[in-house]
């Protein structure tokens, strides 16, 4: 990975490298080979890794489709949420190696997942849950990542009802962005909210600290007695 990054950056210095840093050894993995996984981030400086921790805490575990996360009212470990906001110091050598997100190409979209975990909630409440997830990962230390269309409440309807959580072979009717939804004011409001989050992050350098030392010096959790509250 280091050789690949060095070769590409010789001609294209602005290319960003990131990926899924899961430790997925197979029978072909040599025992003396160190893999480019989250826990080895210090060995691949400049390479970013998806944070499955922030994803699962915000929306619910990937391995149980109806399990709620923090944004749907579940009580989750505050220490884990605080670590996410600070760019996962347990494995990310530098904050820019932690890629924060709530949805990507795999699994259900964020809004679909919220529909599964909060089926009785009105749409207005689900939208607020969606926006809470976006605010948390976009304002956390690290690199924010959002799936195309999340800013317009992207959904992937299933062929036989429900939602498609593995759409790599699904048709355009599932994977396309439904631009017509932007005709509705509530969808435009979400789009504006995402734009505002991005602008706010760009405007405040303290949300984009570049070293682990800077994060430790500038970002501190604030004690909240409410189990549903985290503050910094």
Stretch-by-stretch model annotation:
Residues 95-232:
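Loop/helix patches that line or flank the sugar-binding groove of alpha-linked glycan CAZymes
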Residues 2-93, 150-196:
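Active-site-proximal helices and loops of the catalytic beta/alpha 8
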């Amino acid at each position: 990975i280091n050789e690949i990054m060095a070769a590409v950056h010789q001609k294209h210095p602005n290319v960003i490298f990131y990926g899924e840093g899961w430790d997925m050894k197979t029978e072909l993995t040599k025992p003396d080979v160190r893999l480019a996984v989250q826990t080895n981030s210090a060995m691949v400086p400049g390479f970013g890794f998806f944070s499955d921790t922030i994803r699962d805490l915000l929306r619910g575990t990937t391995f149980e489709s109806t399990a709620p996360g923090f944004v749907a009212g579940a009580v989750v470990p505050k220490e884990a949420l605080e670590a996410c906001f600070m760019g996962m110091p347990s494995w990310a050598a530098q904050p820019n190696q932690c890629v924060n997100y709530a949805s990507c190409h795999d699994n259900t979209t964020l809004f679909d997942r919220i529909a599964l975990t909060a089926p009785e909630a009105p749409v207005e409440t689900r939208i607020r849950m969606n926006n809470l997830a976006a605010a948390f990962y976009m304002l956390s230390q690290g690199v924010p990542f959002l799936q195309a269309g999340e800013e317009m409440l992207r959904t992937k309807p299933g062929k036989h009802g429900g939602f498609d959580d593995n759409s790599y072979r699904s048709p355009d009717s599932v994977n396309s962005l439904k631009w017509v939804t932007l005709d509705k004011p509530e969808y435009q409001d979400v789009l504006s909210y995402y734009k505002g989050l991005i602008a706010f992050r760009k405007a405040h350098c303290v949300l984009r600290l570049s070293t682990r030392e800077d994060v430790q010096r500038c970002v501190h959790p604030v004690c909240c007695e409410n189990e549903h509250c985290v503050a910094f």
